Amino acid sequence: MAWLTHRPIGLTHSESGSDGGYTLFSSVRGHHASIIDPQGQIVHQWHHPEGIQHVKLLANGHLLIQTLPPADAAGREKIGGSAGAMIELDAEGNTVWEHRDITQHHDYVRLDNGNTLYLAWELMPQAICAQVRGGHHHDDDPELMWGDVVREIDEAGELLHEWRSWEHLDFNEEVICPLESHKEWTHANSLEVMPNGDWLISLRLTSTVILVDAGSGDIKWRWGGSQAHNEHDLKRWGPAELSHQHNAQRPANGNILVFDNGCHRKRGPSYSRIVEINPETYEFVWSYSNPTVLAFYSFMVSGCQRLANGNTLITEGASGRLFEVTVDHQVVWEYISPWTIPSPFGPSPAVFRSYRIKADDPRLAGYALSAANYESLNTAIAAGVLQTEPDYHEPETQPTL
């Protein structure tokens, strides 16, 4: 989405019909994470000196953050979404657990047994790289491409299991978009664990969502990509309807919900939308896009969340816009992130993802949530004063978040 140089920040719209509750978010490459109330007032913050890429509130009420990669991270390609560590913070910001892996990226899940799943990159064998289709080549392409891996570690950080995507993906089905580079194959950007333990993974570069059998590692279900070439493929995998999507998930109704970013669409302009499909029939159940098509677009990051009352919280990530829509597409709540952070694209308000939390959620029991604790900050935001952070050294990042 394009925006005015002097645009409003903070809460810009609220009306009846919102699901209410608190909203958790952080700025991409910032050093803070915030909880805001329905009025857009900051009621709690965490800070971390290593920077923050992504945050999630755990079942125990702690915050699990993914930090920025270290500037001197030798042996790691500088790819968008890269991280350095997962760090668990309590309500006061104290570190209670951490795991460092400079190949981790984008997303992670704390399991009920205390183990943690996360996405990582690994260089693929030359024989595999030679078979990857699509993308455009440059003279400076690396000899080996990066492939996606899912790792499971225990509470001590010991590796228990590792799934290498290239051992299960089909070269003819996972074809890189022709407008993307040949540096990596799939660029996974979201990971969700299904009720039966299987993994739902979004693959950005091939515009595909896959369901992985957690036991065998096989691909059980697939949506999108370049596979819908004939009637057999269409029946097997569904229509190719996605374009560099993020945040694939399964709402309580069993459907699949996705933020479809919309870069490099085959026909027409680039625009974003939220899409919900029935995974059995691939039929569209619900979708959201702006009637003024170009008014809703994020070329990177972004997400969505189905709320208890049926509304959907949407993170239009590149512009830092968080908004809630009803089933009938009415916007009932909107908030613009007040932070701008140094980035490869200039000062950026980007938010990777946001999460709505009910006011009576037991995970908040240990928090003294109060706008009064951040009175001066809330006053400045209400007055339209942009919040900035000092410049800091950061490795170059590809625009493929």
Q: What is the meaning of each model-derived region?
A:
Residues 1-401:
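Histidine-/acidic-rich catalytic cores in large beta-rich domains
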